[in-house]
Regions:
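Conserved phosphate-binding elements of NTP-dependent enzyme cores
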Residues: 1-946
Length: 946
């Protein structure tokens, strides 16, 4: 009898998994203690995620769906059970993965964490309204109070009580006057003049008019209180809650209302409600940008990028160089009419001529129609044509073409605030809701802690609970190292690590208990300094009664955990076993690759020498994007460069949002606009830029390492040359799963079918026709060395290297995949199943297999994400090979093994957010370690043994 399984089954204090065979897991048994912090570690591709997400989480999700009604389950379809014998002790499971929260431009940190919802409630309940016309405080009264105020202010004075009906609108209003006359009213005030309502009265329908109904004329006296009361009630009814008082003696006007109103201008606001402060609601959103904060506008700089060129030579990009056609003839006529020609440089054309060319004109100009005729016509302009193409819903191609001439600019009406004028004129302690949304979380925490003192007793009673909720959520964001962010930061602009920590903070704030949380590398993007705060937050979540599983490679996280499960020993088919399970103390004495790195038996060595580079530089000047403070950076070329700094210090803004877009525009005509900068020098020393990120290598199960590296075309060509293929007349397309012919049509060559789960993520199930092989029966009958095309795609890279050893064109491409440590993945493994680290290494392998000039700049943003110590060692070998070829590798990184291995470092800081945005230190790792300004220096000294 197998006693290990019996022990696992009997132990009710743990999540007990046994017989797990998902992906590469080899029938493993694992016990994860309840109410403890457990780290699952191992090499990239060893099976960590297969255990944590594809087994434990998948089974938790399946059991949750089984609790639904049969109707709901039918709507969702059947969730397949993970390949596991049994899981006991499983509590409700919440998965927090390293994916960007939301690509929707309306999603912000404030909306995701619900802090903005509480702010909306706060402003709706205690915000003080101010008129955007006069700056006066808005007021509202009861009818009784209005009567008291009129008697007090106008006692003994002749007044006219009126009801505002029309405010500055066009129309003849004949029907309105007729209705008022029938109700017995005698006078109206039209555009400031009182006149009698005579039969047939009507106004100029094409002019704007303001109309008020005269309800009563009286000399205000206390004894007439009842009359005044009736008058006010009638005027309120006719004026939709607003009355207007005109004092004859001093020619003054005042407004009174039961709703919020400006007593000077008569401007009224709706009764405040939370949706009035939402940029996702028509009641709160800016009418110009519809709550987005930006608008798309035609950019003259994109239409005419080079003003020194002539129109004939192609200065107007949408038109290109001169062609003998109608539009060029029109533009030629406009130029000649003003005494210029198409060959005049654009910078020498007068503004009015250029304006006519771009925007058109209404003047009929004589055009030369050839030998026999002349004709006259108006010209619409280049901009109108581009706008027509942009608005063409029928043609995506036309829209894409027009889109290249547009730029996104801050909305001119709301200045990026997303809200309408009314919503932005409610204040608490002198700040509107947008002011709070733009504050860094650390500053907003201070404001919420002190603002209660600035409120009246009544406001304090209303706001106390709301402020408490806001403060607690801000506290949790601060605890996970996100104090440098602001609530209006777009969710799509967050890194995977930031998104995950936001979700973590939200979960800590929810105070759920008896839940199993599974997190995927929460330390991504976190500086070593902030790691302790993250670990403390996870322990807080554990201490209130939850079980935490973290898939992680961070040494500090492992040592601070309660329990470690090490999956390995290697990756792919050589992994999938539990090589260690126990406490961190026990692990230090164990014999695994992970343990060897933690206890110091293995290490990533410090390079014996630092390279000097090729003597050339790429100099970026005057960077001011986001929090960058007019930064100048001089990148030495031919080196492994590293950008370091605490979270939010400006690393990504400098590299991903400034340098990379500039180079992409230069080399590839990219449409992405760089952040503000002055100039970039040294471009002549770089001939290509390659951004190697961790995004998937494709968007569908059809993309894989073989298609991405281009080796699949060579493999298909081998199959086409086989005698059986020639007899059957098969062409390369027969062996493609992207086109009809040879592929399985039931799954369209995917090998899987996607089952729509409505409000849950879609589930992929193997195709029942081809059993996941992707091809039809006839195609699979063609074999090379006894293997079908599907068998070849099912080979690991290591197997393929042996199989194709006599085919240099194929071997060269797949050998590189083996060299970057991906020998365990399958040639045809769908890109959707590759981790971020694996995708990145496939991209690096593709670049390594190409011939390069040695002047390429490679940009990598946190390439160590998802990588084990051993994987990082392999990655550094690949990066160093690229540098040895003469290229420059620029890495944004927090991992100390990579930082200590760099030739040259730029450390950003000193802090995050507004306190960052400067280069505080630069030089070799040894020079950075000696810096007193750098926060990274202390951690680097430890790594360098100083």
């Amino acid at each position: 009898m197998d006693t290990s399984k019996e022990i696992i089954e009997e132990n009710s204090d743990s999540v007990s998994v046994y017989g797990a065979r998902v992906h590469n897991l080899k029938n493993i048994d694992v016990q994860i203690p309840h109410n403890k912090l457990t780290v699952i570690t191992g090499m990239s591709g060893s099976g960590k995620s297969s255990l944590a997400f594809d087994t434990i989480f998948a089974e938790g999700q399946r059991r949750y769906i089984e609790t639904f009604s049969s109707y709901a389950r039918n709507m969702l379809g059947v969730l397949e059970r993970p390949d596991v014998d049994k899981i006991t002790g499983l509590c409700p499971v919440i998965s927090i993965e390293q994916k960007t929260v939301n690509k929707n431009p309306r999603s912000t940190i404030g909306t995701v964490t619900e802090i903005y919802d509480f702010l909306r409630l706060l402003y709706a309940r205690v915000g003080e309204a101010v008129s955007y016309k006069s700056g006066e405080k808005m007021v509202k009264y009861t009818e009784e109070k209005i009567v008291d105020l009129i008697i007090e202010k106008y006692f003994g004075k002749k007044t006219i009580v009126m009801s505002p009906l029309i405010n500055n609108r066009k129309g003849h209003y004949k029907e309105l006057f007729e209705q008022l006359r029938k109700k017995g009213y005698l006078n109206v005030r039209i555009d400031g003049n009182i006149q009698e309502i005579i039969p047939g009265l009507k106004l100029d329908r094409y002019k704007n008019h303001s109309i008020e109904l005269v309800v009563d004329k009286l000399k205000v006296d206390e004894k007439d209180r009842q009359r005044l009361k009736d008058t006010v009630a009638t005027a309120m009814k006719q004026g939709d809650g607003i009355i207007m008082l005109y004092c004859v003696e001093d020619d003054s006007i005042n407004y009174y209302s039961k709703t919020l109103m400006d007593p000077v201008s008569g401007l009224s606001y709706r009764e405040p409600a939370p949706h009035n402060f939402s940029f996702n609601s028509p009641q709160g959103a800016c009418p110009k940008c519809k709550g987005l904060g930006f608008v798309n506008q035609i950019d003259l700089g994109k239409i005419i990028p080079d003003m020194s060129k002539s129109i004939y030579a192609g200065a107007i990009l949408p038109l290109g160089s001169y062609k003998n056609n109608f539009i060029f003839n029109q533009i030629a006529a406009i130029c000649e009419n003003a005494g210029y020609s198409l060959k005049t440089p654009v910078k020498d054309l007068p503004d009015d001529v250029l304006d006519d060319i771009l925007n058109g004109n209404d003047i009929k100009i004589k055009y030369d129609g050839g030998v026999s005729s002349n004709y006259f016509a108006t010209y619409d302009g280049i901009i109108k044509y581009i706008e027509m193409q942009q608005n063409d819903d029928e043609s995506t191609k036309a829209q894409k073409w027009a889109g290249q001439f547009y730029s996104q600019i801050v909305c001119p009406e709301c200045k990026g605030a997303r809200l309408n004028k009314e919503a932005l004129h409610y204040y608490i302690d002198g700040k509107n809701i947008f002011d709070l949304a733009t504050m860094e979380i650390s500053d907003l925490m201070q404001w919420t802690n002190q603002v209660e003192k600035q409120l009246s007793n009544q406001q304090q009673a209303i706001a106390r609970e709301i402020l408490k909720e806001i403060s607690s959520r801000l506290h949790f964001l601060n605890e996970v190292g996100l104090d440098y962010l602001s609530l209006n930061r777009n969710s799509a602009s967050l890194s995977g690590g930031e998104s995950q920590r936001i979700r973590l903070a939200t979960q800590i704030g929810s105070q759920l208990v008896n839940v199993l949380y599974i997190l995927d590398e929460p330390s991504i993007g976190l500086h070593q300094r902030d790691n302790d705060r993250l670990i403390k937050s996870l322990k807080e979540l554990r201490d209130i009664g939850n079980t935490i599983i973290v898939v992680e490679h961070d040494k500090d996280m492992m040592l601070e955990s309660d329990y470690i499960v090490d999956i390995g020993p290697k990756a792919g088919r050589k992994g999938g076993n539990v090589v260690f399970a126990g406490t961190p103390k026990q692990m230090l004495n164990s014999d695994t690759i992970t343990a060897d790195y933690i206890n110091g038996k293995r290490e990533i060595p410090i390079p014996p020498i630092r390279r000097k580079g090729n003597g050339h530089f790429l100099e970026l000047k005057g960077c001011k994007g986001n929090n960058l403070k007019n930064v100048d950076v001089k990148f030495p070329l031919g080196l492994l460069l590293c950008i370091t700094g605490v979270s939010g210090s400006g690393k990504s803004t400098l590299i991903n949002d400034t340098l990379q877009p500039i180079l992409s525009q230069k080399f590839y005509n990219s449409l992405k606009e760089p952040r503000e900068y002055k100039e970039l020098l040294g471009l002549e020393y770089v001939d290509k830029v390659v951004t190697v990120d961790q995004a998937p290598i494709g968007r569908s199960p059809r993309s894989n390492a073989a298609t991405y590296t281009g080796v699949f075309s060579d493999i298909r060509n081998i199959f086409v040359e086989l005698p059986e293929s020639k007899i059957r007349g098969y062409k390369p397309g027969r062996f493609s799963f992207n086109v009809s012919g040879g592929r399985c049509e039931a799954c369209k060559g995917n090998g899987y079918k996607s089952i729509e789960m409505n409000f849950l993520p879609d589930v992929l199930v193997p195709c029942e026709v081809c059993n996941g092989k992707r091809y039809n029966r006839e195609t699979l009958e063609v074999r090379f060395k006894g293997k079908s095309i599907a068998d070849v795609l099912d080979m690991t890279i290591n197997q393929a290297v042996e199989f194709f050893e006599s085919f240099p064109s194929i071997l060269n491409k797949i050998k590189v995949l083996q060299d970057v440590g991906l020998g365990y993945i399958k040639l045809g493994q769908p890109s959707s199943t590759l981790s971020g680290g694996e995708s990145q290494r496939v991209k690096l392998a593709a670049e390594l297999s190409k011939r390069d000039t040695g002047n390429t700049l490679f940009i990598l943003d946190e390439p160590t994400t998802g990588l084990h110590f051993e994987d990082i060692k392999i990655l550094l070998g690949v990066l160093n090979e690229l540098v040895e070829r003469g290229n420059t590798v620029l890495v944004i990184e927090h991992n100390m093994d990579v930082i200590k291995s760099a030739d040259y470092i730029f450390d950003m800081g000193p802090e995050g957010g507004k306190n960052g945005g400067q280069v505080v230190a630069q030089g070799t790792p040894e020079e950075i370690a000696a810096s007193e300004k750098s926060i990274t220096a202390a951690f680097l000294r430890k790594e360098l043994g100083r």
